[in-house]
Amino acid sequence: METLSFPRYNIAEIVVHIRNKLLTGADGKNLSKSDFLPNPKPEVLYMIYMRALQLVYGVRLEHFYMMPVNIEVMYPHIMEGFLPVSNLFFHLDSFMPICRVNDFEIADILYPKANRTSRFLSGIINFIHFRETCLEKYEEFLLQNKSSVDKIQQLSNAHQEALMKLEKLNSVPVEEQEEFKQLKDDIQELQHLLNQDFRQKTTLLQERYTKMKSDFSEKTKHVNELKLSVVSLKEVQDSLKSKIVDSPEKLKNYKEKMKDTVQKLRSAREEVMEKYDIYRDSVDCLPSCQLEVQLYQKKSQDLADNREKLSSILKESLNLEGQIDSDSSELKKLKTEENSLIRLMTLKKERLATMQFKINKKQEDVKQYKRTMIEDCNKVQEKRDAVCEQVTAINQDIHKIKSGIQQLRDAEKREKLKSQEILVDLKSALEKYHEGIEKTTEECCTRIGGKTAELKRRMFKMPP
């Protein structure tokens, strides 16, 4: 029962919530912690439970003092003092499971305890909070639904108005019905005439199309025939050309012309060959002159290069002398720096040795600390294992207790069923007893009536 689905409040918080949610006026002001601690007051709990039932179910105060109608009671005056408690327990028995409390009993009303009552009241307060949030959401949903219903109503009204307008537009008034009929007849006649004209025109066009198609096919045939005739004529022309022979005079003139052209071509070829020989001789003379000129140019260029090299070597020698002087001064500086660095290195080595000694010492201290921590962790782990074993044992005990409680509840249910059966048997026995008493009373009455009648007869028969 410790893993519940609602928070457990302390007594101060319960008093504040009850003043704000359940009790109002003087009852809420008079409520205090002393009403719940050390022992809760039953009359205060009756008032709180009744107010919660009034808030949730709308149960009135007079309902708690009324006999239930669905139960037959032989002696109702005996139950008058116990009616409020029984009705309160009857309503709370159905209300507490809704608040996630499943172990509420009548002893919690008659002889309340502080821990159980605080749990019951915290469950009731949690349910009231949940109910208020649900009511707020439901009210928002109702407002949205109302606005949507109003919009739907407006849209339906607008739709109906539009339908009415459409009906008015579609419907023809009585005054214009005759004109509408005449116009309708005229339109039908015009449609009929137009259809006839369209059919006639379509038939004429189809006939023309068939004629054009036939003419086109004839023309294509004629064109194909002409093409065949042209091809045949070309073949005849080629055959005739091969058979034609030129005249001898034309052949002679043509040969003379060809000879003249050949002589002209030969003379032109000879001139070209002569010019080629002259050009080749001139080209052969050119390379020797060019070689001499190139040699002179190379020598002059080598002299210029040598001059430039000499000037550059002189400059380099001067630069090297300056560099040698600067390097000698730098060497002196470097020697002094080297001596200072050697001194620094010795100092740093000494410092490193001291630091290494300190580091080794710290490492040893850390190792020792780790060993102690591991030992402590092992001890804690052992304690944790022991606690886990205790927790498992406690959980097993709780499980056993829960199973025992369940068994007790089952036994209680069985005893309740047995008591109900006994009550039914007692009721039936009482009814039989009452029936026997009624029968005996009736028999006694009949006997007494008979005896009184006999006595009366005897009295009347006796002489005076």
From Swiss-Prot:
Protein name: Kinetochore protein Nuf2
GO cellular component labels: cytosol; Ndc80 complex; nucleoplasm; outer kinetochore
Cellular compartments annotated: Nucleus; Chromosome, Centromere, Kinetochore
Annotated segments matching region Interaction with the C-terminus of NDC80 and the SPBC24-SPBC25 subcomplex: 386-464
Pfam family, one: Nuf2
Single GO biological process annotation from the record: kinetochore organization
Annotated source species: Rattus norvegicus (Rat)
The keyword Nucleus belongs to this UniProt entry's keyword annotation: yes
Originating gene: Nuf2
Sites of Phosphoserine modification: 171, 247
Keyword Phosphoprotein in record: yes
Main function: Acts as a component of the essential kinetochore-associated NDC80 complex, which is required for chromosome segregation and spindle checkpoint activity. Required for kinetochore integrity and the organization of stable microtubule binding sites in the outer plate of the kinetochore. The NDC80 complex synergistically enhances the affinity of the SKA1 complex for microtubules and may allow the NDC80 complex to track depolymerizing microtubules.
Chief place of localization: nucleus
Annotated positions of the N-acetylmethionine modification: 1
Coiled-coil intervals: 148-201, 249-372, 413-443
InterPro entries: Kinetochore_Nuf2_N (IPR005549), Nuf2_N_sf (IPR038275)
Taxonomic classification: Eukaryota, Metazoa, Chordata, Craniata, Vertebrata
